[in-house]
Regions:
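Short, well-structured N-terminal submotif of metal-dependent ribonuclease cores
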Residues: 1-36, 48-62, 126
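Histidine- and aromatic-rich ligand-binding microenvironments
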Residues: 5-6, 36-38, 89-91, 112
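A generic structural signal for short hydrophobic patches within well-formed alpha-helices
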Residues: 10-11, 41, 78, 115-116
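Acidic catalytic patch
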Residues: 64-87
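Acidic, PIN/NYN-like endoribonuclease modules and their adjacent C-terminal/linker elements
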Residues: 67, 98-126
Length: 126
C-alpha cells in the first residue's frame, strides 16, 4: 500500500504529538512507500517559516524529500483537483492532494476533517 502523508499529518509528526507518533510509524517503516504532493511540501515549508525560521523549513523539507517520492502537480492532477474542488467545499490545496492520491493509487494519511469518511483515507483525527 502506498501512503500519501498529508500536511496535517506531517505537522503532527514534526510537532512530536501523540498522533505524530502514529505518523512516525509510517515514516520509519522502510518498507512503506510514501508519497507527497508538491502542495504538501509547500504547506509544511510555509508552516515552518511562519512558526520558526528558514533553517527549520529547510530541515523539514530535506526530511520529507529524503523519505518520500515527490509528486508534482501536473496537468492531469490540476484538472482532477479542480473537479474535486468544484464538487466539494474544500480548498484547492486539499483537492489537489486528494487528486494526487487517487492518481497514484495511494491511501491518504490525515486528520484533516475534509478527508473524513472518504475511501482510501486513514483518518487520524476526532
Amino acid at each position: 500500500m502506498t501512503v500519501l502523508i498529508d500536511s496535517w499529518a506531517w505537522a503532527e509528526f514534526f510537532a512530536g504529538s501523540k498522533i505524530g507518533e502514529i505518523v512516525k510509524t509510517y515514516v520509519m517503516d522502510e518498507d512503506q512507500e510514501i508519497i507527497i504532493s508538491s502542495i504538501n511540501l509547500a504547506e509544511i515549508y510555509r508552516l515552518a517559516l511562519d512558526r520558526f525560521d528558514e533553517k527549520t523549513a529547510e530541515k523539514r523539507r530535506r526530511a520529507m524529500i529524503s523519505r518520500c517520492y515527490l509528486i508534482p502537480v501536473d496537468e492531469e492532477i490540476a484538472i482532477s483537483g479542480a473537479k474535486f474542488r468544484h464538487e466539494r467545499d474544500w480548498g484547492l490545496g486539499d483537492a489537489l492532494i486528494y487528486a494526487t492520491a487517487i492518481r497514484e493509487d495511494a491511501t491518504v494519511l490525515t486528520g484533516d476533517p475534509h478527508f473524513k469518511g472518504l475511501n482510501d483515507v486513514i483518518f487520524l483525527g476526532d
